[in-house]
Amino acid sequence: MNVVKTDKKGRFSLPGFEKTRFISITTPAGFETQQFYLPVKENRKSYDFLLTESERTQPREHSFVQITDTEVTGGMGRWVTDLQQYVKNEKPAFLIHTGDICYEPGLKMHNQVVNAETMNCPVYYCIGNHDLVKGNYGEELYESIYGPTWYSFDIGNIHYVVTPIDHGDNPTDYTQRDVYNWLKNDLAMMKKDQSLILFNHDLFTPGDTFVFKADNEHILDFRTFNTKAQLYGHMHYNYVRNQNGIYTICTGTLDKGGIDHSPSSFREIKVDGNDNITTQLRYTFIEPQIAIVSPMNNQISAATGDRLPVSVNTYHAQAKTSHVSYILSDIENNQEIAKGNLISL
């Protein structure tokens, strides 16, 4: 609930809050930690966090991967390998799962397979409506495995904020007022020139105003915090909309496709040196493919002088295409005529 800055020696003191179950840190840009939160224990007087320097969380230009709604109650699938290899090859700054992990079996299983060690990058989670399960309160099991339902971290010049869904299969212990109070305190610590990206399992702020309203008296206008995007899942479809400079981005599932008939996919988001974002989907379950588009069999090519345009399509679920090489040979005697690398368009 309360948010404070450490002193020069890294020491801090937090006021109490009756619902406090975790002490968490906003991991600063240029650093990583194996655990950004610690459970609160009775009679414990200090909470210490170990930070290590990190080159991948420092650059203003960086990328991250979003997955969502894996709903792994029946077990994990081949998508895990595609995701793992893509992260290994493309080296995003972090991976985030925006909720619906799902139910007791999924909650207990998912973090054993998709975590910072198996993915070799920081991994974060949001709580979804199907992650609010039976217990003393809906988020109890989630918290015991994944930690707090709200937290933040910095990478490059972006302040990333994870927020909890406000509804689900079982009642939550947190309220929208609790979320507002923490958000207000957290955002107050942003640096003057920082930008903001928000995560939630569902659409956090509907409409073009980007206002979070806990009640009539407690309101946050995210446009005043240089917000660049809000990302979510829940709907099982792919959607990107630029709303007067702020992107609203919904991502479908990488294991079963979307209800909009979109293929199974996860999302990569790139942040440039001015904090502007671009995004593309990466499709799962696709083995390395290459197809010559032009010239085609039994067709006359559009050759000009000694130039022969060659066009190919390539794709692989586990990596982007780095280059395409070619060899041109005489069909009658198989003699090599030319070879080289094609230029990406």
Language model regions located:
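Binuclear metal-dependent phosphoesterase catalytic core
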Residues: 246-316, 320-325
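Short Pro-Gly-centered beta-turn/loop motif in secreted/extracellular proteins
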Residues: 13-22
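Active-site glycine-centered loops adjacent to acidic/histidine catalytic or metal-binding residues
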Residues: 69, 99-100, 128-129, 201, ...
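Long, low-complexity serine/threonine/glycine- and acidic-rich segments characteristic of extracellular
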Residues: 311, 322-345
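N-terminal active-site segment of His-dependent metallophosphoesterases
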Residues: 22-109
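His/acidic metal-ligating clusters that form di-metal
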Residues: 85-94, 170-248, 300-312, 316-327
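Extended active-site neighborhood of metal-dependent phosphoesterases/phosphodiesterases
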Residues: 27-43, 107-190, 215-229, 237-273
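Short, acidic Ser/Thr/Gly-rich low-complexity loop/linker segments typical of extracellular
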Residues: 2-11
